[in-house]
Amino acid sequence: MTETPQVPPRRLLIALGSLVLILMVGGAVSFVRYARRHAPQPGLIAVAPFDIFAVGLDRWRVGLATALSERLNAPPLAAVPQTVVAATWRSAPRPEISAVELARQTGAGLAVYARVDSLPGKPDSVRVSLLAIDATTTKVLFGVLLRWPAADPEGLAARLAEHVRHNHPVRTFPP
């Protein structure tokens, strides 16, 4: 005697198919909600600690980042608090990449990385380089290169904030 394979009843197949469909739709909805909640905020800026390569200006490392964050933290922009930056920051051989990772971890749409270098033969001045990087695409949106008096870190923070506000994709005032 040969046995014929049992074919499941049609209702059972419909029920299993419906269950699979419901689970797929539920997973898709869950993913979309998660992605929307964790999308970078375009008006949020993560200012990484400055790299300081100028003798005697080590105090600027966090101080400049804090001052710049405070000046950028006004509508329509917002800055990630430096306490959060300190807890999240992970240095790497390429600090601009670390700045982008900082922005991604904090939900910021823009990463700001800057460095301060000594100028040969000019002990009273420094060269400041700033990069603003889109955290989603990792594209450099703009850069700033300044020569600045070493005795004026507050003025430097104000000037850099002005550059960031003026060039940020979320326009803060007409061009």
Q: Language-model features: where?
A:
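C-terminal/domain-edge helix-coil "capping" segments
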Residues: 2-20, 26-43, 121-125, 136-175
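Short beta-strand->alpha-helix linker/helix-N-cap micro-motif
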Residues: 40-126, 134-148
